[in-house]
Amino acid sequence: MSFSVRLTEVAEGAHAYIQDDGSWFVNNSGILVGSRQGLLVDTCATVNRTRELLSTARGIGLPPNPLVVATHHHADHTNGLSLVEPSAIIAHAEVPGEMAAAFAIPPPGLFEEVEWGEIEVCSPTLTFEDRLSLDLGGLVAEVVYCGTAAHTRGDSYVYLPDSRVLFAGDLVFNGVTPFAAMGSIPGWIDALSSLAELAVDVVVPGHGDLCDASVMRSVGRYLRFVEEVAGGAVEAGVSPLEAARSIDLGEFAGWLDAERIVGNLHAAMAGLAGSAVDLIGVFVDMKEYAGGRPLRCIA
């Protein structure tokens, strides 16, 4: 099986592994190779996709048993961890608990059929609260917690200060609709403000093509748009699905996975009400918004 992937050198010893088209469960990774150690930033959703990632990484010098940073707990970024045989799995302290409560493979019927393979869930072996500095040998990688619940409760990013490269994880989507149902929209907006203070020339988003720091403004505009719609929906007494169906997505209409507007409205409206997000309701309503069919997934 072949996949559409692109490998781009973003700094000496650092490559972005971009999987097209960045939609549901099709994420990006990073491959860092120093003189002393190698590091992967995230794995992939399926066994076959992770094997492709590892084959590519080894072809450019990734040594056996590298470090792996899991930028957050979601399955598209962590399902392949067992295949890597890492020396350590690094993640924020919130991630082990979130992994234990999440699904590695979504329930049948929510998404189009995917050949996931035999998934073995691997929890992080090295957690941190704020940040870690990793000297790989001629290549320093800063692993930093975003400071707040955002896309999830445990998002971190990998920053290469010497080359001004940011592996943003799912704090940044480029041309793909962000998804906040397991995090916090106000927190995500705050996290983007913090990211914008970094000196960055190249951003490797969690999903979508390589970009520059202006992408953070685009994601921020979308999240503020969701907040505005949610406020109106609460005032009008309509449901997230009803609100989503009533609006024009405007500049965001061309982004992939547009049905996430429903899940994001669930999150924003629950936040305004001080209640928990009904994740089952989120996926049921997104599927309904998409015409009642399983959600498109090419993973």
Regions from the language model: what does each represent?
Residues 238-299:
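C-terminal regulatory/interaction regions
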Residues 1-12, 297-299:
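Basic/polar N-terminal segments that are highly enriched at the extreme N-terminus
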Residues 7-56, 156-169:
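Conserved beta-strand hairpin/beta-sheet module of binuclear metal-dependent hydrolase folds
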Residues 48-51, 55-133, 153:
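Active-site HxH/HxHxD metal-binding segment of metal-dependent hydrolases
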Residues 13, 32, 42, 57, ...:
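Divalent metal-coordination and catalytic microenvironments
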Residues 37-39, 43-47, 133, 140-232:
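Metallo-beta-lactamase
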Residues 10-17, 112-116, 137-144:
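Short Pro/Gly-enriched beta-strand edge/turn motifs at strand-loop
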Residues 21-22, 102-108, 115, 176-182:
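Acidic/histidine-rich helix-loop elements
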